[in-house]
Amino acid sequence: MKITRIEPILIRTPLVLDAAVPHASGAPKNDVHTVLVKVETDEGVTGWGEAFSNAGWQSTCTAIAQIIAPRVIGKDPSQISQIQADLHRGLYNTGRSGPTVYAISGLDIALWDIAAKRAGLPLYKLLGGSARATLPAYASLLRYGDKKMVVDKIAEALGRGYRLIKLHENKSDIVRAASIACGPQVPLMVDCSCPWTVDEAIAISREWVDMKLAWIEEPVYPPDDHSGLARLRAASPAPIAAGENISNFLEFKRLLEAGAVSFAQPSVTKIGGVTEMRKIFALGEAFGVTVVPHSPYFGPGLLASIHVCAAAAREVWIERYYCDFAETPFGEQIIPRNGDFAIPQEPGLGKDPDTAIIARMRV
């Protein structure tokens, strides 16, 4: 089998919005952009991956089409480890983070999709299997910056069966209102989005001590200040989580060696795909750190995260951005039911996208 074509596909999925309009980077967030990676082979097996996009989707699409594809077309898609190694070594001078690594991540997910399809297995079984049929999802609320909106969204999420809540807020009055809304039985996590110095974060963590947060996520800027995070972790009453902005194994190793976090959060669309994500799980086990992936995605990135987590020895929480769509190319597979994700049972990632919907959403 040979790879014959690699295509980046950008889609825009509109959000279903109510009175509570979320914000991102200071502007209303009305939709989600996703960079899909479609890998075709000469035997008719097609794999689907996802590369981190956010505001830099143009650069990521260019990296896929002009940097990655020419180096990989014609290769055997089953040689995943060798393809990964060749790309990382051959492209080191483009940087160890950013669009090139995001492109490699999307390719890697697609190659694992192909491998599992050829084996006739859902990916998690190819990775070691699981005794579980579901994994708990946590409702990862978007940023609202408004106390009432946040409290209303928490009530809605709990009503849908979620048992774990995460905020993207950093104002104490909002966090405290959310803690009251959750009550003592619902774990509450807070993603702060890197707003503070280490000393400021220590002060805030102590101010929040009575809320008994499950974790405080990315409280410090810059996010790669590992020694600063370690100092915060030693002083904070709440556990510290970080890692979504790390894009290579070595940097994750440095994070854990520094003793910076209790929860490590690799992102499969940034770290190098399934191949590198599995290494981070092993690294976490070696350091006694819990790995809980960053997965605010709605396609192959989310599905790949579910499969890797399903194959882990212990139960892993799955992040699900708490928002709704009128339609999505990946249908019901990306929607939790009663607060749980069903582990996909079809070969590969378990769900190929609806190409008609892709055609309507394509940018």
Would you name each region that the model predicts?
Residues 167, 172-297, 336:
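Catalytic core of soluble alpha/beta enzymes
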Residues 2-4, 8-17, 29-34, 275, ...:
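Flexible C-terminal active-site loop/helix
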Residues 3, 44, 68, 107, ...:
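Conserved, mostly hydrophobic/aromatic
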Residues 1-46, 65, 81, 155, ...:
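Non-catalytic terminal accessory/regulatory regions of metabolic enzymes
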Residues 135-149, 192-197, 241:
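Active-site mouth loops of central-metabolism enzymes
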Residues 6, 40-118:
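Metal- or metallocofactor-binding catalytic centers and their adjacent structured scaffolds
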Residues 74, 121, 238, 289, ...:
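Short glycine/serine/threonine/alanine-rich loop segments
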Residues 94, 118-143, 178-179, 183-185, ...:
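N-terminal small/glycine-rich loop or linker at the start of catalytic domains
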